[in-house]
């Protein structure tokens, strides 16, 4: 007989919940079917925060600590790779926790050019950093290169040479960009072959290797612009990163880091610049944002390409990278912009393992235009970039041909531009080595380090003399390095398994991330560690070397027995809850009590425990050694923090007894960090920032910081260029006695100490002689710039915008016409008065307008308010700016009429008042005249009362509070969005209901009822019509079945199927909607409620804690687990559940040790009791709770996580209709939904997480 658990979960649901539904004929075939859940990453929304942050770390930080990393070698010294030499997958999948990255880490990577091999999207090139920490202690020559071999010149080396391209990393670097230096080039040396692991090494002289020839690319279309690009060997600039923290991060439909192609756009704005487009996008990202902008000089990536953007409609957004071409106006600039776009597109395709394939004519491929998306996919109606390209006598076909050529160059398939395609070696114009030939001497030394092989590499070498390496899959793993070899200009490491010592071979220095390591030492120390922390099989391990995760709830005890230092980081080996492995010391907390910060004793004893709090305006840096962060100053101990050695703003100080505390917050946002003890920080007084307009000079290489008095952890970039650069300051702040200025230089913004700035020397002016023939005019207005607070509407007919009041002619100001802008500066020049307009976010100056071209009103100060209003039936809509025009309307009057407007602040504009707030999930400004305030209600506060219910947090932009209605002690809900919140108390204050309960991290807090929901429903577009999918189902070879007469099955017709699949109808039914309940999502049902339900259920009684733990550990809905166990065990009474032992292959029910199986795992039909107990014994399930937790792991890994995670998906598979389905009964999902709903009713809960497909 077959195993029960050969069936997938849905069949198990059919067996365990109903037992009567017909399973599909394709059940066995499903065993080999790939996971087809296209929306998996989006649906797993409760973990989206952790997933995206982890994915960011995957791409941005290839290792935990690379401060000792060797950089890539110069392209000239890299050995050639053969066409069949596979070097690993170009897609990076390594998982790294960014918290383990050393603060001084800088990833130095090679610049992207037209002549590169597979490359990363990082761009800086630095000189190699030499690690010479080598010792001969304990060195054995047993495995050295053979020094006694004859010198043999390999004739094959004369026929091939290194491609003029560097092997470059597939990692993206998150390190701040710094000034770069090019590494010196050196010739590759050809060397004789010898056996690898032999006696000793001797020097050899070798011949120089000539270059390899590659075929030239044959253009597929004629293009004078492409020929111009090739002829001039145009280079693409570095890819700049200008990311915005508040942009949303959602996975593509296939997951994080898995785009399916790239879309070509143009900005459709002839007057815009790349900076202007980016600024506008940042202010209007709710409507649209893209991944990158390209013009003739720059490539600026504005959003991480691992996550989708909003640039091409609902169908294309989850699939493609979106890149905008900024308009240029001359031949050369246009050619450069096409070259830049093609290079960026080819880089993305290569980076994500995609090949160029035009979708323009068939709707299938990896390179799309916006027009093609509109034509073939829908969801948008744009037709760019064809019109713009035609205006330059260019076409999409020409651009695609250039992208394809770039891709082939990067892949090493065709000759790079500027090289000769010939078998004759090319003679360089200048010698790259001294006239005296290199000796090619071999040196070998012992090494005690570690290394990780990069995804793109030259392979493993049996000997360092081998011409080519052998492809290896051992990438992105940490190995021990036992030897270093240098042959000519090539350096190699001998890598071996860290734990067994088995040697893998030699790898080139440029193909690894290397770190020095000290020898491990024995320790005997206990630490506390958080649940979920990863353990690794080696120190500095990667995602491929995970030994397990820490289980349990609350901090666990980690007993360390070994310690090793890798570079500057400490790793410990130990055990926790039966699991052993290595972990970074950064994740451990010494269980010994921290020594409290000594407080100076007062001259006389004090017993003053009175709390005093006062406002403060300062800044502080938390010391590396500290007592932690305190939620309140009454807390006995603080919580450990990693926010050390960073500058924060200080808003309050508190004194309690003999202790003094500072309240620190993020300098650039309202996010509160917590209270810290005075002795744990370096504090400085600070004056409030003031606006300035001053130009300075600054030297290249000077660091810019995200905050004044910033640390190395808060670098915003470095000044680029050669010679003194111009720094335009817009803000100034005094910290203690030092002055810091905020400004912009070469497109980068940040804070810098005034000590690094110099005032440019004023040009000498010739003294003008008075001319009696010209009568001087009388100045009646002050000739200085005044700071003002006004607001202005630009008239349709205006004289234009000026960068300075001194400009004689203005630029066209048509795009600002009929729009409202803030006014921050005013200046008289001659007889004219000009004002400086800022964009709607207040912080980006646009330019100067003559007041004659504006309607100007005074602007008051913004005042906080908390009030609900009803929008009048007749209103002017929701606007982006107070006193906004029709061109700045977010929602029209009809869209918000008679709706509820939640105001958060207000401002006066002339005699009118405008309120800022939220309506219909959009935020903006409404004129107070368009609002009606509710009847005033006398403030009331009800007493807090007990209230037990588990809600779901629905507003990640909301806050949780230490006390209800507090404006200060509030913290962001972003990290807890879509997670359960177990409520224990309810209180109403001034009409607002507050709930007090436990967050998912165990912290107790108050949350507004408006930020919570009883259930979280998500809708997913299938992209198909209901009639279409119903037709597919009805036309299957194995017809869907229906019982029109009880017990008699007949084939279902089209109408039967359509009725059963209609998600709109099903979602309205309170019971049937449970077929959309996510079975892979626990919902934190209280242990008490579970135990009440399990009362009288045999051995399952009082096992609520075990079911709760199992659900949390393995991500399974508790109610499903319980229902499965109840049916398998006959309500907890079966012998398999009550337990037994198997002795001499016989079942013994009265043994002292009994083994339990509550899910029927491996209970084969021929002898279910014996086989089930045998499996439980092998698994170690000697208690019922172990059987519950262990069995849940099996079910979660084998069934629930298989992809189709709701009953509806199991039955109908809306992602791929007609395939991989688990039942033929059209009512199968309905029947099971009612059963699960019944269990929920008995427990006294409701389902929390629903995922509902939608059809066109």
Swiss-Prot record:
Subcellular location: Secreted
Recorded catalytic activity of this chain's protein: Hydrolyzes the link between N-acetylmuramoyl residues and L-amino acid residues in certain cell-wall glycopeptides; an N(4)-(oligosaccharide-(1->3)-[oligosaccharide-(1->6)]-beta-D-Man-(1->4)-beta-D-GlcNAc-(1->4)-alpha-D-GlcNAc)-L-asparaginyl-[protein] + H2O = an oligosaccharide-(1->3)-[oligosaccharide-(1->6)]-beta-D-Man-(1->4)-D-GlcNAc + N(4)-(N-acetyl-beta-D-glucosaminyl)-L-asparaginyl-[protein]
Protein function: Endohydrolysis of the di-N-acetylchitobiosyl unit in high-mannose glycopeptides and glycoproteins containing the -[(Man)5(GlcNAc)2]-Asn structure. One N-acetyl-D-glucosamine residue remains attached to the protein; the rest of the oligosaccharide is released intact. Cleaves the peptidoglycan connecting the daughter cells at the end of the cell division cycle, resulting in the separation of the two newly divided cells. Acts as an autolysin in penicillin-induced lysis.
Positions of region (Disordered): 103-151, 172-219, 419-440
One term of GO molecular function: amidase activity
Domain GW, first and last residues per copy: 443-517, 519-593, 612-686, 688-762, 784-859, 861-936, 943-1017
Protein name listed in UniProt: Bifunctional autolysin
Major localization listed first in the record, in broad terms: secreted
Stated family: In the N-terminal section; belongs to the N-acetylmuramoyl-L-alanine amidase 2 family. In the C-terminal section; belongs to the glycosyl hydrolase 73 family.
Endo-beta-N-acetylglucosaminidase as annotated region, ranges: 776-1256
SUPFAM superfamilies referenced in this protein's UniProt entry, alphabetically: N-acetylmuramoyl-L-alanine amidase-like (SSF55846), Prokaryotic SH3-related domain (SSF82057)
GO BP annotations, alphabetical order: cell wall organization; peptidoglycan catabolic process
Recorded name of the encoding gene: atl
Keywords: Cell wall biogenesis/degradation, Hydrolase, Multifunctional enzyme, Repeat, Secreted, Signal
Signal peptide: 1-29
Modifications after synthesis and translation: Undergoes proteolytic processing to generate the two extracellular lytic enzymes, probably at the septal region on the cell surface.
A GO-annotated cellular component: extracellular region
Source domain of life: Bacteria
Region (N-acetylmuramoyl-L-alanine amidase) residue spans: 199-775
Positions with biased composition (Polar residues): 103-138
Any coiled-coil regions, as ranges: none
Top EC class, one word: hydrolase
EC number: 3.5.1.28, 3.2.1.96
Bias kind Low complexity: ranges: 172-196, 421-439
UniProt free text on domains: The GW domains are responsible for directing the proteins to the septal region.
InterPro entries (alphabetical): Amidase/PGRP_sf, Amidase_domain, GW_dom, GW_dom_sf, MGlyc_endo_b_GlcNAc-like_dom
CDD domains: PGRP
Organism classification: Bacteria, Bacillati, Bacillota, Bacilli, Bacillales
């Amino acid at each position: 007989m077959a195993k029960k658990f050969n069936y997938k979960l849905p069949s198990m649901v059919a067996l365990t919940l109903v037992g009567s539904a017909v399973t599909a004929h394709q059940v066995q075939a499903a065993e080999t079917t790939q996971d087809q859940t296209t929306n998996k990453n989006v649906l797993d929304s409760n973990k989206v925060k952790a997933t995206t942050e982890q994915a960011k770390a995957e791409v941005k930080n290839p290792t935990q600590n690379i401060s000792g990393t060797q950089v890539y070698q110069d392209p000239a010294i890299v050995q050639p790779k053969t066409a069949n030499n596979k070097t690993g997958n170009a897609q990076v999948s390594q998982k790294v926790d960014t918290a383990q990255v050393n603060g001084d880490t800088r990833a130095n990577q090679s610049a992207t050019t037209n002549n590169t091999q597979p490359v990363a999207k990082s761009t800086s090139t630095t000189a190699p950093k030499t690690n010479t920490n080598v010792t001969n202690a304990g060195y054995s020559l047993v495995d050295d290169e053979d020094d006694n071999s004859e010198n043999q010149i390999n004739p094959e080396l004369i026929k091939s040479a290194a491609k003029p391209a560097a092997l470059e990393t597939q990692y993206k670097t998150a390190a701040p960009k710094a000034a770069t230096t090019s590494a010196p080039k050196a010739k590759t040396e050809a060397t004789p072959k010898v056996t690898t692991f032999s006696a000793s090494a001797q020097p050899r002289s070798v011949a120089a290797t000539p270059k390899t020839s590659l075929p030239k690319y044959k253009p597929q279309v004629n293009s004078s612009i492409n020929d111009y690009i090739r002829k001039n060997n145009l280079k693409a600039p570095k890819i700049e990163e200008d990311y915005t923290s508040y942009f949303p991060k959602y996975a593509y439909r296939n997951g994080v880091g898995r785009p399916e192609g790239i879309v070509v756009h143009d900005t459709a704005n002839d007057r815009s610049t790349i900076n202007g487009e980016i600024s506008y996008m940042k202010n209007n990202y709710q409507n649209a944002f893209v991944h990158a902008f390209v013009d003739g000089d720059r490539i600026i990536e504005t959003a991480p390409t691992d996550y989708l953007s909003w640039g091409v409609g609902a169908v294309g957004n989850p699939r493609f990278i979106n890149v905008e071409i900024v308009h240029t106006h001359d031949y050369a600039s246009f050619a450069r912009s096409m070259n830049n776009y093609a290079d960026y597109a080819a880089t993305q395709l290569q980076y994500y393992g995609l090949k160029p394939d035009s979708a323009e004519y068939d709707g299938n491929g990896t390179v799309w235009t916006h027009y093609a998306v509109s034509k073939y996919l829908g969801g948008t109606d744009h037709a760019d970039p064809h019109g713009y390209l035609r205006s330059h006598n260019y076409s999409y076909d020409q651009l695609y041909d250039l992208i394809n050529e770039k891709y082939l160059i990067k892949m090493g398939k065709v000759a790079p531009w500027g090289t000769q395609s010939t078998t004759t070696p090319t003679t360089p114009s200048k010698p790259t080595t001294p006239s005296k030939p290199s000796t090619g001497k071999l040196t070998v030394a012992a090494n005690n380090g570690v290394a990780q092989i990069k995804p793109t590499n030259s392979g493993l070498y049996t000997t360092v003399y081998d011409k080519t390496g052998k492809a290896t899959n051992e990438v992105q793993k940490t190995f021990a390095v036992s030897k270093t070899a240098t042959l000519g200009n090539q350096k190699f490491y001998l890598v071996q398994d860290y734990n067994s010592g088995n040697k893998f071979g030699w790898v080139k220095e440029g193909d690894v991330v290397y770190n020095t390591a000290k020898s491990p030492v024995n320790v005997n120390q206990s630490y506390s560690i958080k649940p979920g922390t990863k353990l690794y099989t080696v120190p500095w391990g990667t995602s491929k070397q995970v030994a397990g995760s820490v289980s349990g709830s609350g901090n666990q005890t980690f007993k360390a027995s070994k310690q090793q230092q890798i570079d500057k980081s400490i790793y410990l080996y130990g055990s926790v809850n039966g699991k052993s492995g290595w972990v970074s010391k950064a994740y451990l907390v010494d269980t010994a009590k921290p020594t409290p910060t000594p407080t100076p004793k007062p001259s006389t004893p004090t017993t003053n425990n009175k709390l005093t709090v006062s406002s403060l305006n300062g800044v502080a840096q938390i010391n590396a050694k500290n007592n932690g962060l305190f939620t309140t100053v009454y807390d006995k101990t603080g919580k450990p923090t990693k926010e050390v050695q960073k500058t924060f703003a200080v808003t309050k100080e508190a004194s309690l007894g003999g202790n003094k505390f500072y309240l620190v917050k993020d300098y650039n946002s309202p996010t509160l960090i917590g209270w810290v003890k005075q002795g744990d920080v370096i504090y400085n007084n600070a004056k409030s920032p003031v606006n300035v307009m001053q130009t300075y000079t600054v030297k290249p290489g000077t660091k810019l910081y995200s905050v004044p008095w910033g640390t190395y952890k808060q670098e915003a970039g470095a000044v680029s260029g050669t010679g003194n650069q111009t720094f335009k300051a817009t803000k100034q702040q005094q910290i203690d006695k030092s002055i810091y200025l905020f400004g912009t230089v070469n497109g980068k913004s940040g804070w810098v100490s005034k000590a690094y700035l110099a005032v440019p020397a004023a040009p000498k002016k010739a003294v003008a002689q008075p001319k009696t023939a010209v009568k001087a005019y009388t100045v009646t207005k002050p000739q200085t710039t005044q700071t003002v607070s006004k607001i202005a509407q630009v008239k349709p007919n205006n004289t234009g915008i000026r960068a300075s009041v001194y400009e004689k002619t203005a630029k066209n100001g048509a795009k600002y016409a009929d729009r409202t802008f803030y006014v921050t500066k005013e200046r008289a020049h001659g007889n004219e008065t000009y004002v400086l307009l800022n964009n709607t976010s207040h912080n980006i100056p646009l330019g100067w307008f003559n007041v004659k071209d504006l309607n100007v009103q005074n602007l008051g100060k913004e005042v906080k308010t908390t009030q609900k209003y009803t929008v009048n039936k007749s209103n002017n809509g929701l606007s982006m700016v107070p006193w906004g025009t029709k061109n700045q309307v977010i929602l029209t009057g009809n869209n918000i009429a008679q709706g509820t407007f939640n105001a958060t602040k207000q401002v006066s504009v002339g005699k009118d008042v405008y309120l800022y707030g939220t309506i219909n999930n959009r935020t903006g400004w409404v004129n107070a005249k368009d609002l009606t305030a509710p009847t005033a209600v006398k403030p009331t506060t009800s007493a807090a009362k007990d209230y037990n219910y588990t809600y779901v947090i629905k507003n990640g932009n909301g806050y949780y509070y230490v006390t209800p209605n507090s404006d200060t002690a509030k913290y962001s809900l972003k990290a807890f969005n879509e997670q359960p919140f177990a409520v224990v108390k309810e209180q109403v204050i001034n009409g607002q209901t507050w709930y007090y309960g436990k967050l998912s991290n165990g912290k107790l807090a108050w949350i507004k009822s408006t930020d919570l929901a009883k259930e979280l429903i998500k809708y997913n577009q299938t992209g198909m019509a209901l009639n279409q999918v119903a037709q597919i189902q009805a036309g299957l070879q194995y017809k869907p079945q229906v019982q029109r007469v009880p017990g008699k099955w007949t084939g279902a017709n089209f109408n039967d199927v359509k009725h059963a699949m209609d998600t709109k109808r099903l979602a309205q039914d309170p019971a049937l909607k449970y077929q959309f309940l996510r079975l892979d999502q626990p919902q934190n049902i209280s242990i008490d409620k579970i135990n009440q339900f399990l009362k009288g259920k045999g051995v399952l009684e009082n096992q609520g804690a075990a079911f709760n733990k199992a659900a949390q550990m393995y991500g399974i809905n508790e109610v499903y687990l319980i229902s499965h166990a109840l049916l398998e065990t006959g309500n907890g009474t079966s012998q398999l559940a009550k337990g037994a032992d198997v002795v001499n292959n016989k079942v013994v029910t009265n043994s002292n040790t009994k083994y339990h199986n509550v899910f029927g795992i491996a209970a084969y039909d021929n002898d279910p009791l014996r086989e089930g107990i045998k499996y439980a014994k092998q698994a170690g399930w000697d208690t019922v709770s172990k059987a519950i937790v262990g069995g849940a792991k099996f079910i979660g890994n084998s069934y629930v996580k298989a992809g189709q995670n709701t009953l509806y998906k199991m039955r109908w598979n809306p992602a791929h209709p007609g395939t991989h389905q688990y039942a033929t009964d059209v009512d199968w999902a309905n029947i099971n939904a009612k059963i699960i709903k019944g269990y929920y009713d008995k427990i006294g809960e409701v389902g929390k997480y629903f995922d509902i497909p939608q059809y066109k």
